[in-house]
Design a protein with these regions (language model features):
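Conserved nucleotide-binding/hydrolysis micro-motifs of P-loop NTPases
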Residues: 8-10, 32-35, 65-69, 94-97, ...
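Canonical P-loop GTPase G-domain recognition
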Residues: 85-88, 95-157
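Flexible beta-alpha connector loops of hexameric P-loop NTPases
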Residues: 2-5, 34-42
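P-loop NTP-binding site
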Residues: 157-267
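Conserved, well-folded catalytic cores of nucleic-acid-processing
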Residues: 18-22, 37, 52, 56-59, ...
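Switch I (effector-binding) loop of TRAFAC-class P-loop GTPase G-domains
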Residues: 1-24, 70
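Amphipathic alpha-helical transducer elements in NTP-driven molecular machines
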Residues: 9-12, 42, 46, 53, ...
Length: 267
């Protein structure tokens, strides 16, 4: 449902993913990672996550088992009120963790969340995801299905087009620049064949503009080419994509810009 990247804090919105089988409908709500914010964007992301945590029947806390417990983990525990909600703690990337270090990490969480259920996973390989689904089923209260069975997410095509473009940028650039990038869809000509997509890549500094474009425009052409392929899979038709890079200074701290780019938390 959301983009994947080795760079942290890439999920910026609450995203619903809908699971259906012959027994149940499970609505998963993927939230931005809770963190100590440096800009208003980070505060908005945290607010989305805090709000979601209060509105769920089961909370799932995903922990990177390959990394030791740190200040960021403690920050999440201190700020996320999930002690009254049935809790599953998922230790993902368990295949990359040393056994003794993984047990040490689990002991830390077990001391804090005494009633939590622990599940090891390797999400990328699908390992133990069936156990996670089974456990969620057992914890959920009975109720009506909220969405049609053919729905897999609450997000529309424009949202996914933006996320595809952003994902390709993340794969092309270093750690610092991607956090200051937003995507704005200027126009989509749906009636045109192929579909015409005009999008702006928003950066905060003039120097970042050149980094995104690359020497002779090589990088932005590659971003556009990779994005086009995935967007065509999404829309199941050919598309033309035009990408422009624009500067919006300090947009991560500007309320109007945050709202324009879809990152303003609304209660």
């Amino acid at each position: 449902m959301s983009l994947s990247s080795l760079i942290s804090l890439t999920t910026r919105n609450n995203i619903i993913g809908i699971y259906n089988d012959n027994e149940v409908q499970i609505v998963f709500l993927d939230t931005p990672g809770i963190h100590k914010p440096k800009q208003q964007l980070g505060k908005e992301m945290n607010n989305m996550a805090y709000s979601a945590a209060h509105d769920v029947d089961v909370a799932i806390l995903v922990v990177d088992a390959s990394k030791p417990f740190g200040a960021g983990d403690q920050f999440i525990i201190d700020h996320l009120d999930i002690h009254k909600t049935p809790l599953i703690i998922v230790f993902n990337k368990i295949d990359l963790a040393r056994l003794d270090k993984a047990e040490e990490l689990k002991a830390t969480y077990r001391a804090i969340f005494k009633k939590a259920i622990f599940i090891d996973t390797v999400a990328k390989e699908g390992f133990n995801i069936d156990t996670l689904i089974k456990t969620v089923k057992e914890l959920l209260p009975e109720g009506p299905a909220y969405y049609p069975t053919e729905m897999v997410t609450d997000k529309d095509e424009i949202f996914h087009i933006k996320e595809i473009i952003r994902e390709k940028i993340l794969k092309q650039l270093s750690e610092e620049v991607p956090h200051s990038i937003a995507i704005y869809i200027d126009n989509i000509e749906w009636e045109h064949k192929p579909v015409q997509i005009f999008a702006s890549i928003i950066v905060e500094k003039e120097s970042q503009k050149g980094i995104v474009i690359g020497a002779g425009g090589k990088r932005i052409k590659e971003i556009g080419s990779q994005a086009r392929k995935d967007i065509e899979k999404l829309l199941k038709q050919h598309v033309f994509i035009d990408l422009q890079v624009k500067v919006d200074a300090d947009w991560r701290n500007e309320p109007l810009s945050l709202k324009t780019y879809g990152y303003k938390y609304e209660k």
